[in-house]
Amino acid sequence: MKYLIIGLGNIGSEYHETRHNIGFMVLDDLAQEKGVTFDLKRHAHIAEVKVKGRTLILVKPTTYMNLSGKAVQYWMQEEKIALENILVITDDLALPFGTLRMRMKGSSGGHNGLSHIEQTLASANYTRLRMGVGSDFAKGQQVDYVLAPFSAEEQKEMPDVLKRAKDAVTGFATIGVERAMNAVNTKK
């Protein structure tokens, strides 16, 4: 069975390890753990990992965040992956840093990357892993906040956050979305 795991982020070194790129960070960490590297292909950097007999196709769109749907749609069709086997990893300002929430469907919550995916796929019925990045910013400073690096304190906690996110990704593919949601949504 194949799964499409999309980590949202922006390409370019200036965005490396910023809050908005936490989706990329999860996939980078998973690829490193599995000893694979990403290759630049159409609309994305792609890597493939095997987990308990399942194939996870890791996708880091090169279309910039607000056009992520283009890469998702292309790789979904290219690999012939059903909507229920897609997981999108994204940052979430509404959740405290380190909090993870997995949902089988839902709204974009104002997230432009998710909005474009929903618009392109004509559906919001795909699983998403929302990763809390906090909301410690002044009114009107949201863009600067998500494009800024994590604080020193947050960086200390990042290995644990990434481990829990990787566990959520592999759980999605191996134990199913319902059980993965139970495991993810009951932990901090």
Swiss-Prot record:
It comes from Cytophaga hutchinsonii (strain ATCC 33406 / DSM 1761 / CIP 103989 / NBRC 15051 / NCIMB 9469 / D465). Its EC number is 3.1.1.29. It is found in: Cytoplasm. The keyword Glycoprotein does not apply. The record marks 91 as: Stabilizes the basic form of H active site to accept a proton. This is Peptidyl-tRNA hydrolase. It is an enzyme of class 3 (hydrolase). Hydrolyzes ribosome-free peptidyl-tRNAs (with 1 or more amino acids incorporated), which drop off the ribosome during protein synthesis, or as a result of ribosome stalling. Catalyzes the release of premature peptidyl moieties from peptidyl-tRNA molecules trapped in stalled 50S ribosomal subunits, and thus maintains levels of free tRNAs and 50S ribosomes. The keyword Mitochondrion does not apply. Monomer. PROSITE patterns: PEPT_TRNA_HYDROL_1 (PS01195). SUPFAM superfamilies: Peptidyl-tRNA hydrolase-like. The active site is at residue 20. Keywords: Cytoplasm, Hydrolase, RNA-binding, tRNA-binding. Belongs to the PTH family. HAMAP family: Pept_tRNA_hydro_bact. It comes from the Bacteria. InterPro entries: Pept_tRNA_hydro, Pept_tRNA_hydro_CS, Pept_tRNA_hydro_sf. Pfam families: Pept_tRNA_hydro.
